[in-house]
Amino acid sequence: MKKGLLAISIIALSSITLLAQNEIDALRFSQDAPLGTARFSAMSGAFGSLGGEFSALSLNPAGIGMYQFSEFSFTPSFNLNSNTSYYGDKETDYKSGLKIGNIGLVFSSLRENSEWKRINFAIGWNQLANYDSNIRIQGENNTSSIADNILAISQGNSINELNTLYSAPAFWTNLIDLANNSVDTITDSYTHDNGNYISHVNGNSSKTQTKNIHSSGGKNEFIFSIGGSFNEQLYLGATIGVPTLDYYEKSTYSETNFEDTINGLQGFDLHEELSVYGAGLNLKLGAILRVSENLKLGASLHTPTAYSIEETFSTSLTTHFIEESFTERSNTNHFEYDLITPWKAILSASSLLNKNILLSADYEIVDYSFSSMHSSQYTFTDENNVIQKLYTKASNIRLGAEINIKPFVVRAGYSKYGSAFANKDYSKENFSFGLGINNGGYYLDAAYVLSQGNGEHLIYNEDYINPVSLVNTNHSLVFTLGFRY
């Protein structure tokens, strides 16, 4: 019997596959993976004490005081991302695309009769994270089904009380059913609407489980910087950052090739769609001290970013039986909340050797357990408790080198971003290389960046299934064209 459509008004605040408004969002939007200009990228972002580089204004704004000319820079990049999953089968999926890493304008002014030799201003835009990726997961499972998860959260609820994102679509497409689904022919209503449900999937029989996840978007920051040089020895600066979030995720989870089902179910597809938009505000303060002609030290402090975020989330479920298929779509759920990201502190040092070899290093510390979520619609008590228990303090290291071999400049870098998890090592490494030509009035730089890291994805509730291991690899080609005037 095909079930009719019933209006459901319950708003579900969380996804059984952990997609919306939870600790995963808090971590995703708290982490940075800056790309920026080609010079910045080629040296793996180790610019905390170097200065004179637009992307560095999102790290240590004191570097603006080292500009001796006004400057414009523009950076496009090409990215190829791959994700390999290990869930019985080894699956690899790819995504490529073009991004803008930087657009920046610096205004430099010389003050000849003042100890503050320069007061400089900058306005522009830096890329802080790229969310483009495709993930494919596939394997055989004879111990559980996502239908078991849906059945568990449905039990004890009448039809009108079913979760609108998962339980109600599962019921109206016959993935789950009332244990006694007798219908009163006069009232056309169920006679045993008592919250006792059964699943049409035998979780303990063999089946193929497949999930495809397509993500896109990024985190970018508009910056407004001011800074100066005191006797060309002490450099101070401040940046007001206005980061923006744009994240879209669409996933399809399928179960097929059932060894044993009920009522002739051949398979089903669960679609989830998440859109996130947000904007925030932060302040960055920094200082660089020229200890000697060949040594500079830097320090900077980033306040938490206060984000206002709006999410929309919806699902649809299609079941395939021998004779027909059924599809049911949830309403689109709109949700607004605030996210507070952690403080960040950076210590830096750089040295110039033989006037043509530049070495630099940054040490950065950020405590991801500081993140918190807030809303007038929901308390987020459980999510904030999970953030404090699950996440920890992470140390990030960036190393860079530059050799001037006229007319070219050769650069290389390495960085390691520590794991945000208290009990799991999901650190990330970057290896980079680049070349540049500096002709005084203009410069042209190119860089290649290889990023590698491990992670995991939970297909559905961890009470039923273990997380799937992921290996993420990203290749970036970055080009910057700049003009000085």
List where the protein language model places each region:
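Bacterial Sec-dependent N-terminal signal peptides
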Residues: 1-24, 481
